[in-house]
Amino acid sequence: MKKSKGLHELYNKDPITADKFVWGRESDPISRRGFLRKAGLASMSLALGSSIPFAKNFPAGMIPAAFSQSYDPFQLYGKDDLILLNDRPFNAETPAHLLDDNVTPASRLFVRNNGIPPVESQIDPKKWMIHITGESCMNKTTLSLEELKTKFKHHTMQLQLECGGNGRSEFTPPARGNQWSTGAIGCPEWTGVRIKDVLEYVGVKEDALYVAYEGGDRHLSGDSRKKPISRGVPIWKAIKDESLIVWEMNGMPLPLIHGAPVRMICSGWPASVSGKWLNKILIRNIVHDGEKMNGQSYRVPCEPVKPGSKVDDKDMCIIESMPVKSLITFPKSGVMHNKNSKLKIRGHAWAGDSRVKELFCSYDFGATWKKAKLDRPINTHAWQHWEHDVEFPQSGYYEIWARAVDDIGRSQPVVLPQWNPRGYLNNACHRIAVSVKI
């Protein structure tokens, strides 16, 4: 008996061959469009339950959005709507349509852990201490959380956090790590103090290069001598006005799972630099060499490589600013819509350390694009909201694609960006399926 294979398994192995096997589809190596013969078009239309008006524009090696996500339900207290990826360490993401809020609720912010969080019963905010040290720290100091709150000016900002591996599940061949879809992103409101104010208080030597953190989480092995993660940012990033040490999220005390009682926020970079359960700040005179700073972690090849290649550690570069990206949050993928009315779509866009300048939408697989209404960010490093009305020419199967362009002209790619071994920085256009009926 032949082994059966799922659609995703076939496409992960060889998307072009899968196209031909599943749909009888031939691909143009130059345009990257797929040509469906009559039988293949009928097969895909039957599977989708509708005709495909712009089938000729559909990119090669791409699974239709209607089939691109399938989830088994799994509930966790306070995170009922998240999709579980693994449970040790606990990591979970939010489906795109549940990220529709302008300000992300705590219950819908993705969770990414590298170790075991501290036990809530053992955390007393009144006794929590933050040690500030390192080769480039002039006056090594220990501050209580209460002192942090009383010695420095408070700031409240809406700042986005995105996992460096958001979108990893779309890479072919598959990349190692949690198979995030599109939901490892959020933009809550945070309250705390600026890192630069704390650094000025303790004094920083002229040779300072990096600011790093350590947290109260434990290594998965249980070995107290090992740190599950200790990352950092260059000093210039740490002293930006938007780089904070925070204790509130959306006006409430930080939830334990999001770093209570206090954490760092260095928005626009991989969320792994925004350390949770903060108990130590290190001012370094070298590029920080803590856990998850070296090797392949949160690094990409310094030069483009062939998909599936093995890359030496010495040829990997640290990820800094995240790329331009967008998300469709309304409607939910798979929506049924009446042709006689316009479909209102909306979502968010962001661009690491930059700002999104324009947002475009397409309903014909990228053949044409229409400019959407794009709001300005409420503050630097907050995501931007956009909306657009779509009018369909006829009934059938459609996909809405969203493409953001940042303020220096960098645009989201229609298909997957450059492959890398760990599946970081996927900023391909987000898309949803729409069935239009008369």
Placement of each model-derived feature along the sequence:
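Short alpha-helical segments used as structural interaction elements across diverse proteins
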Residues: 29-30, 34-35, 109, 400
